[in-house]
């Protein structure tokens, strides 16, 4: 669940058109001496550390403007440009929309993806989630859609299974409880309203643990407004995958300690159904591990949900 095998078949620095690389160097004020493609993630766009001739490092993301993921990249750079300086995220230095390519240059953040099975690293992640809730409430981007508007049509996997023939390989517990899962899933939006700017895609490979112990949150491509507890609950299956008592964690964390357990179960149910449905779709050709990740997430979340609900 920690994203170590999540790498897509990324575009490389030398695959960018000469004119795009030249413009990046011009705007950066130095030549690129070396480029290192960064691991992790499911997007096939360029994501690389650039070592500049003047000794500075920057981080570049880029994608063809006609690519199916270009809108996601545009959302990310527009969001990054509007995040407050107090948010634990790399600063966007500049962006380019030039000769058919969308480019974003960020501050380079040294570090590694946090390992959720290491108590100190998990503690840093949990502290950062508390910081996000405090810093991003109310949302500094009030014009964003709500989580119900963005995700309501997507988080209906159990309903679709119930209305059609469920997949033959669906586990016995989910098959027996399919109607109840669809009913619980349908209630998650009742609890999710709020005015916090949410990331909605927190995973270890979307975070970096810096040498000073602070966490930088990356890849703001799916922002929306909703309840402050959503991001922690969305990350919690990745924590549960390490055998950690995630129910106890949610009961004691400041962001979730006062939240109705029914609300948590409803959102977990919706996540499990989403992953169960998406994992059975054909794999994107340049992100072959995505469906495997979703299948693992579905199993972990469904198992945890079964223990919570005691059905």
Model-derived regions: residue spans:
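Juxta-kinase regulatory segment immediately upstream of eukaryotic protein kinase catalytic domains
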Residues: 1-35
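A cross-family kinase active-site recognition segment
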Residues: 2, 112-175, 193-195, 224-225
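Active-site acidic catalytic loop and adjacent metal/ATP-binding pocket
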Residues: 39-52, 59-60, 183-230
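Short acidic/glycine-enriched loop/turn segments that link adjacent beta-strands
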Residues: 41-44, 98-102
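A conserved alpha-helical element in kinase catalytic cores
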Residues: 57-99, 115-131
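Conserved short submotifs of the Hanks-type protein kinase catalytic core
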Residues: 101-112
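Hydrophobic/aromatic-rich alpha-helical bundle segments in the mid-to-C-terminal region
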Residues: 143-144, 282-295
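Active-site activation/catalytic loop segments of kinase-like enzymes and analogous catalytic loops
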Residues: 229-258, 268-286
């Amino acid at each position: 669940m920690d994203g170590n095998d999540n790498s897509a078949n990324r575009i490389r620095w030398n695959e960018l058109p000469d004119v795009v690389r030249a413009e990046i160097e011009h705007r950066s004020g130095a030549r690129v001496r070396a480029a290192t493609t960064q691991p992790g993630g499911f997007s096939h766009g360029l994501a690389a550390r650039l070592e500049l001739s003047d000794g500075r490092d920057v981080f570049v993301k880029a994608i063809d403007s006609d690519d199916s993921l270009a809108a996601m990249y545009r959302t990310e750079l527009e969001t990054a440009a509007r995040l407050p300086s107090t948010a634990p995220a790399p600063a966007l230095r500049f962006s380019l929309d030039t000769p058919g390519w969308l480019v974003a240059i960020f501050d380079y953040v040294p570090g590694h993806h946090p390992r959720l099975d290491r108590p100190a690293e998990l503690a840093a992640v949990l502290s950062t989630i508390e910081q996000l809730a405090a810093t991003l409430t109310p949302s500094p981007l009030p014009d964003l859609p709500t989580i119900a508007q963005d995700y309501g049509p997507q988080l209906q996997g159990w309903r679709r299974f119930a209305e059609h023939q469920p997949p033959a390989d669906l586990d016995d517990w989910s098959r027996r409880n399919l109607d109840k899962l669809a009913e619980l899933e349908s209630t998650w939006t009742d609890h999710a309203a709020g005015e916090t700017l949410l990331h909605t895609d927190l995973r270890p490979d979307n975070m970096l643990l810096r040498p000073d112990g602070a966490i930088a949150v990356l890849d703001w491509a799916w922002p929306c407004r909703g309840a402050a507890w959503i991001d922690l609950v969305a990350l919690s299956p990745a924590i549960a995958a390490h055998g950690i008592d995630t129910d106890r964690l949610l009961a004691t964390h400041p962001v979730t300690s006062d939240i109705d357990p029914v609300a948590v179960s409803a959102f977990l149910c919706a996540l499990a159904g989403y992953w169960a449905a998406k994992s059975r779709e054909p794999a994107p050709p340049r992100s072959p591990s995505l469906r495997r990740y979703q299948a693992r997430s579905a199993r972990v979340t469904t198992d945890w949900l079964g223990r919570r609900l005691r059905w």
